[in-house]
Amino acid sequence: MESPMHLPEVIAVEQESQQMGLSVTAPELHGSLSGLLAGGGCNGPDWLAMILADAGVAAPPKGSVLERLYQATASQLEDPDFAFQLLLADDGATLAARAHALFEWCRAFLGGFGLAAHCRSVLSAEGDEILRDLAKLAQASVDDFDMNEEKEDGSLEEIEEFVRVAVLLLHGDCLIGPCAPQRLN
């Protein structure tokens, strides 16, 4: 049996999304969901309708791939061991496909985070800076980079790790508020 914190495979998310008639990729769906949850938004079955801005979209059925995606993402964000992972491209995807999925994920994350905008005013200075950095990534395109597999693979992995940690920091800001420097006098 799969761990409740294990994200479903990209292909399974894509297939179920298509079966439901959704025109969204797995990275977009996970990015939007992650943004919504990181910002303290919807905590229930209406998450899909909320991120798609379509009240007519039914909640994913219990035990479905999309319901497992929601449960795993929520669990990962709350994990004290920082288990949060990005759902991007399948293993073996080209560097360009992986980069495109990351930029797509970032665009969707910002949209989902914006839906939970009530927490925006409580972000730390680092949180504000991270949002600006994520916005730059969201505007990026694979055409902006030299897609030399050997040279750029490590760089893309570093950017993915930055995004992963950025999401956790933003979630922390929204969950407990920014940490203000303490004065000792």
UniProtKB/Swiss-Prot annotation:
TM ranges: none
Entry's Gene Ontology cellular component terms: cytosol
Top-level taxon in the UniProt lineage: Bacteria
Similarity comment: family membership: Belongs to the UPF0149 family.
Protein known as: UPF0149 protein PD_0802
